[in-house]
Structure formats: structure tokens, C-alpha cells
Amino acid sequence: SGKNMGAFKAVGYPEDVGEYYMLENYKAHTWTAHGRFPTNTPGWWGGAHPFTLLDWSIVHNGEISSYDANRRYVEQFGYRCNLQTDTEVITYLFDLLVRRQGLRLDTAAQILAAPEWDVIDRMPEEKQKVYTVLRTAYSSALINGPFSILVGSKHGLLALNDRLKLRSLITAEKGNKTYFASEESAIRIICPDPEKIAAVDGGTPIFIPFAREGDR
């Protein structure tokens, strides 16, 4: 757990984990949760989601086919991927780009899910220059494969889908609340009548910044 953040992880059914940790006794302005069935990695509590580091809380649905390239990249900066889950390298990429290199969270997301070169070639000139620099300078941070990611941090909450939208990611709003989930039905269990609901576009980050402490 990081500052002002708690993480509750275990191997088991989500409802049992919630009961064990008595989550009904906690209050927070932001929650991330994930019932994960590991496909290519062992099922153990260290790989359970949310995957946390310092003030990062990350949940991820999918498979990172660029894992080895991404792992070699972050290891140049002193990170070590030992926890047998590809979500680990996603977490280290965000930590490297935002905390250590000072980039904005949404800029880091644009690096991880950068557009294809033919899409960049069709962009307006100024935007084309920006994405050309990002793809060139951070080519080893580009994530390939089907994925949907939620990133919670002190900066805010970010949702990101792979460029081809091979994994489902839905967003909804009601009042001052925003919801993200892999399926619309999951959102409607918590919020049966959202005012807005839509699919998150592939490769387009949605960022919900947190209010300043005094404004909450």
C-alpha cells in the first residue's frame, strides 16, 4: 500500500476476499477491483490485482505480447520483474514515465498505446510531430497485445484500451461518479440507471483527475 491507499489481495473468490477484509467498513473516493483468472501465469496472491507499487494501483485484463521487450526496457532503469505477472511490467512503465521521468499520466498512456505509424502520418502536423517523438523515443515502452487497464494513483484514475480494442472496456457516468468495467452488466449492478454509458475507444486514454485535497 502507498500513501492514502490500501490494497486487499488474496487467492479466492472476490466476494470471499471482500468479506475477509471487511471492505464494507472502508470508505474511499476511488476504488479499483478485479476478479482475475490467470491464463499464462501462476495463481498466487502476489500476482492478484490490484497490482500495487507506492501510490500506483493497477488492474489489467488481457495479455501483453510485448512483455519481454518491455521487461528489458524497465530493467535498464533498475526494475526487476519477479512476480510472474505481465501486469508488473505495466506498473513499472507507469512508475518510470510518470514518477521518475516527470511525464503526465495521460502522456504515459499515449506512449504505452501509441497509434500505428500510418495513423500518425495522417495527423495534423503539430500532433504528428508529438507522436513521432513519443513513438521514437519510447519505442520499447509500447505495449502490444489485447488489454484493458485501469490505473489509480495520486494523480487520478486512468482507463486505457489496446489500440485495436481487442478487450472490452466500458465507461459510465451518473452525477459526479464515473465507472469503468469490462462489461456493462457489472456497472449496472452498482449503478442500474447511468446517465451516460459508452465503450472506451481503443488507444484513447480517459483520465479522471482528482480534485485538490481542499476541494473534496
What are these regions (language model features)?
Residues 1-216:
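Conserved short alpha-helical segments that host acidic/polar catalytic motifs at enzyme active sites
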